[in-house]
Amino acid sequence: MSYRIAMVCDFFFPQPGGVESHIYQLSTNLIDRGHKVIIITHAYEGRTGVRYLTNGLKVYHVPFFVIYRETTFPTVFSFFPIFRNIIIREQIEIVHGHGSLSSLCHEAIIHARSMGLRTVFTDHSLYGFADAGSILTNKLLKFTLSDVDHVICVSHTCKENTVLRASLDPLMVSVIPNAVVAENFRPLTQTEPLISPHDAKWLAPNQTIGPHDTITIVVISRLFYNKGTDLLIAAIPRICAAHPHVRFIIAGSGPKAIDVEQMLERNVLQDRVEMLGPVRHEEVRDVMVRGQIYLHPSLTEAFGTVIVEAASCGLYVVCTQVGGIPEVLPPHMTTFAKPEEDDIVAATSKAISLMRNGKIQTANFHDQVRMMYSWTDVAERTERVYKGISGSLSEEEFYGYSPGEGWSAARGRAGVQSFALIDRLKRYYGCGIWAGKLFCLCIVIDYLIFVFLELWAPKAGVDIVRDWPRKKPITTGEAHRDGGGITRKKNKRRREKRWEDLDRHA
């Protein structure tokens, strides 16, 4: 059974990032499986209106005011008219929102429930409980997820965090990790030329590292506080002082870029640290293969897709032991450090020593990562969630027990709840003494706007768009796939048929 799905998030291409890549790869693989998928995001500079991407993936760039880090200004209700128009035009059945800090995501889930649509939310981040910003974010998340069909988290640590923040039943939260297109992140081969002539004097690809050969440490990250840029600034001078044959390549942009440049000038390290600035996602592999070690000093991370990409490129990973990072890669691919300056320096020095002593063999990293992570598998598991919330799977099959064995309130929030306004208000009313009443007021106003739109612009008067020609759904085991979901067997059959036709005419 195929579904019509709308992915909604503030964060999407052309902005690079893990959430953006996740949405794109998941959408294209769901299209390969026979579903219709559209993406709703805000307008970017040079990207407005409706755009088509690979495989007929349609992207709606909604003109909304951006306030901070590509997040739109939260208006609660003003998004409803254009959202309703898109949903009706595309005949959407499931609305899938991404990101706790995405205003479009939260508003889309609320409006979708008012329209009687099934909703799914994917959380990609970890947040605390103490500071004012986290408290407000968690309250907003609890508001939105009080009436959602299912929640997906990218790691078990992220699941625990989301369950606590939004007061959810753990049974209605699934863990589906991110993945990588392994074919796009291959190690540098012997026959492949060096990416940069500057690297030729440092180390040729696959060459044994001697005591005086230079080891290159790669860092690819947004230069923000939560990405551990302050730790990086403190650790680089100490690492360079302790290891004279070590250089750094830093790719990324952000408000901390000025601090990094000041550190380089203060310590006269311009000849040993190369700043590349922002790089496109398709250029990430070309940067990674220039090094032997990948350093990831993040202070908080739900999954860390970039370290999977680095391991796939054959780099040994040094990362902080925070959030869901310990779940991502096996121990022989990583060295963990506490999010402290001394520990970062010690862990990096340990990795350098292991590389020089030949105790780390990275030749098989790519094949191992390809076996562990696949977007095809992620799409299959996400499709199972869609089947569960739409009723195609029984509760016993989807949740793991017979109806009536679990908490009844959770069952009411886990995909079988009523769309009736009174039932929705009961769920929102339990969000707090004052917050519950405020949330109920917002939902009542939202429902009144929906009724007004139904009268003012009836559904029958909205033109239905023609669908992009769909592919035949690809089932598991039908053909050999690589990490990007490319089918090879089908192309082989087409070539054989073409050869048979040519022989027949000859």
PLM feature spans:
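N-terminal subdomain of nucleotide-sugar transferases
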Residues: 1-47, 51, 55-58, 376, ...
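Carbohydrate-associated surface elements
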Residues: 43, 157, 179
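Conserved donor-binding/catalytic core segment of Leloir-type glycosyltransferases
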Residues: 197-237, 249
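Nucleotide-activated donor-binding/catalytic signature segment of Leloir-type glycosyltransferases, i.e.
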Residues: 261-279
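Short alpha-helical donor nucleotide-sugar binding micro-motif in glycosyltransferases
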Residues: 278-279, 286-291
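Aromatic "clamp/platform" in nucleotide-sugar-dependent glycosyltransferases that forms part
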Residues: 299
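Short hydrophobic beta-strand element within catalytic cores of glycosyltransferases
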Residues: 316-319
